[in-house]
Structure formats: structure tokens, C-alpha cells
């Protein structure tokens, strides 16, 4: 699966349309970006060494950031749609217009790669994961 398939398969958007919306939203700003995120999570709950609950969740969304002089604004949504991106762009209008609020120091920049493209949730089957956790609990 290509990364763009994670965001554009059901959103009614494609990569080029999202890029055009982002360019329109950031017109007049010094810098900015559209950040998209897709998250998979899995959890297991044991009680008295017995599996009591197992959960799996998938979520996705985006953040739109605009920088103008020393002011940055950020808007986000879990709805990956044209309407949501336009709504986020509207929330950034004061920053792009030169108005400011609370200023935060930028985080320290790093170029350290923290993650690989390997999905650990696909590595082992459900039964194998439960067995590993049961073995750990029996120690």
C-alpha cells in the first residue's frame, strides 16, 4: 500500500487537490505545512494472568500549520476532507494576517530517524501476541 492510499482512499481528495488546498490556505504566510497522520494501535489487558480485553484502533487526521514572522498557528482535524482543510485554513487567517497570540519557542530540531517503515502490528498473529504476554506474566 502506498502512503497516499492511507489518506486519500475514502476522503474524496487526492494528493494534488490536497496540495492545492494547502497552497491556497498558506497564501500570504512565510511558511507552513499540511501534516497528515495515520495511527494503528493495539492493546491487551490481563487480569490474574488471563486475557480480559483486546483492542485495536485505527485513526487518521491532519494538522495545518502557518508561520508568519515569529507567529505560528496550528489547526487540526480527524476529518480528512476538503471542508475540514478549508475550516482549518480559516482558523489560521489571523496568523497569516499578522495578528498574534501566545508565542511558544520552537522545539529543538533533530534529524534523528526514530522509526522504521516496519509495522509491528503485522509482525505476529493475535494468538502469538497473547502467548508472548502470557509467557511474560508467568515469569
Give residue spans per PLM region.
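Active-site bordering "gate/hinge" segments
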Residues: 1-139
Amino acid at each position: 500500500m502506498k502512503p497516499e492510499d492511507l489518506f486519500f482512499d475514502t476522503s474524496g481528495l487526492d494528493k494534488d487537490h490536497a496540495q492545492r488546498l494547502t497552497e491556497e490556505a498558506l497564501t500570504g504566510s512565510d511558511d507552513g505545512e499540511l501534516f497528515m497522520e495515520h495511527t494503528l494501535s493495539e492493546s491487551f489487558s490481563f487480569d490474574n494472568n488471563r486475557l480480559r480485553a483486546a483492542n485495536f484502533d485505527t485513526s487518521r487526521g491532519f494538522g495545518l500549520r502557518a508561520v508568519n514572522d515569529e507567529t505560528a498557528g496550528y489547526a487540526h482535524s480527524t476529518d480528512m476532507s476538503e471542508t475540514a482543510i478549508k475550516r482549518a485554513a480559516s482558523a489560521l487567517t489571523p496568523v497569516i494576517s499578522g495578528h498574534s497570540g501566545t508565542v511558544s519557542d520552537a522545539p529543538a530540531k533533530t534529524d534523528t530517524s526514530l522509526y522504521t517503515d516496519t509495522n509491528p502490528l503485522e509482525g505476529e498473529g493475535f494468538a502469538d501476541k497473547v502467548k508472548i504476554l502470557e509467557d511474560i506474566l508467568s515469569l
